């Protein structure tokens, strides 16, 4: 049987991959292998690998990258990548996968792909060809594309960009975004169930906010998040759910400042490491807008007909739905954006990332595509 190894480094990413992982696990022609790494294994981030196990998956290997005791700087991130390369080498020796499946543009996936390249393990990559100009994730994503052998893009424009990068057109598949398909399949919680699970009231006026470091910005993450929090002071009648930043450099100062704000606004605000996909999608049915700079605000949130206030440059360059409102980093720009978001209301939105049958399309390729000599690639020149 073909051994498909899925690597996941965070709860958000795992939420996207979970349905596909189950399909692989349940297929009699495939064997699922799971590697958990980085944020999943961090105590600061809640040791979310336990959720993978609760869902009935076996974690075949754990690769420790995060150092919870280290300072929040570039040195720590770079060393995490080096630990990842070493750990993935051991994992690949132990598991001997036939195909590696990875998603996105996180630095832990750069460690995975670099190691797999040396081991001559074919890579199937999801969400290549996208643009996010404000973060070094953008360069990592394109680098992973060049180290990958099968490509599953979320739009036709991104499929063309992967081909533009020299990938052979018969190996690049526009399948849509798994996250959007997951919205359609989600078992939604009731408002009361969400409130009980969070010990937090979802009033008629609610925001959901996630703010990540903008790793290529000259403005400090602290200044950015303080500007956002000052803008939110104009909305004292709104309840706000904040979720944690990712593990990029400067994430800890963002988390610290939001914690302070939530402590000063007890009852009106709450802060949680992660809602988990089911509860996150369920909460989106009861909030007025999503704020911050997460890719989820661009990809999945439009399916709920509510606005996304996309702050700054982190997601700059992505294809967006009509419900996405862009604004700059200053408090005044965020205030103007919030006014537009509040006025937006609820509308039926065409989500550019939706395509029917995403999981089935990926499964068909990873089951049937010939893997013999696939690691030797030819640069595809556009005529």
Model regions: which residues?
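Nucleotide-activated sugar donor-binding and catalytic core shared by glycosyltransferases
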Residues: 1-383
């Amino acid at each position: 049987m073909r051994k498909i190894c899925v690597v996941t480094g965070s709860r958000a990413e795992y939420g996207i991959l979970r349905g596909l992982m189950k399909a692989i696990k349940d297929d009699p022609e495939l064997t699922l292998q799971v590697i958990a790494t980085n944020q999943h294994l961090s105590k600061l981030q809640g040791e979310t690998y336990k959720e993978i196990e609760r869902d009935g998956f076996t974690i075949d290997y754990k690769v420790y990258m995060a150092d919870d005791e280290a300072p929040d700087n570039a040195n720590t991130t770079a060393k995490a990548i080096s630990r990842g390369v070493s750990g993935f080498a051991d994992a690949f020796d132990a598991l001997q996968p036939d195909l590696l499946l990875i998603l996105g543009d996180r630095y832990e996936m750069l460690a995975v792909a670099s190691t797999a390249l040396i081991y001559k393990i074919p890579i199937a990559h999801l969400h290549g060809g996208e643009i996010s100009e404000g973060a070094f994730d953008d360069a990592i994503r394109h680098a992973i594309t060049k180290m990958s052998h099968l490509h599953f893009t979320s739009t036709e424009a991104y499929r063309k960009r992967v081909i533009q990068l020299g990938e052979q057109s018969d190996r690049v598949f526009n399948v849509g975004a798994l996250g959007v398909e997951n919205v359609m399949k989600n078992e939604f919680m009731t408002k009361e169930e969400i409130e009980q699970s969070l010990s937090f009231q979802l009033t008629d006026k609610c925001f959901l906010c996630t703010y990540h470091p903008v790793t290529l910005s000259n403005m400090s993450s602290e200044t950015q998040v303080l500007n956002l929090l000052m803008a939110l002071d104009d909305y004292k009648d709104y309840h706000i759910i904040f979720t944690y930043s990712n593990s990029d450099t400067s994430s800890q100062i963002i988390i610290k400042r939001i914690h302070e704000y939530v402590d000063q606004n007890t009852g009106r605000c709450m802060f949680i490491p992660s809602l988990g996909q089911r509860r996150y999608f369920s909460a989106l049915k009861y909030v007025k807008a999503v704020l911050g700079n997460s890719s989820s605000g661009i990809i999945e949130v439009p399916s709920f007909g509510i606005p996304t206030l996309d702050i700054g440059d982190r997601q700059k360059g992505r294809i967006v739905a009509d419900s996405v409102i862009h604004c700059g980093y200053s408090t005044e720009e965020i205030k103007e954006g919030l006014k537009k978001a509040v006025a937006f209301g609820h509308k039926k939105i065409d989500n550019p990332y939706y395509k029917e049958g995403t999981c089935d399309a990926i499964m068909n390729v990873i089951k049937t595509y010939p893997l013999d000599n696939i690691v030797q690639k030819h640069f595809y020149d556009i005529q």
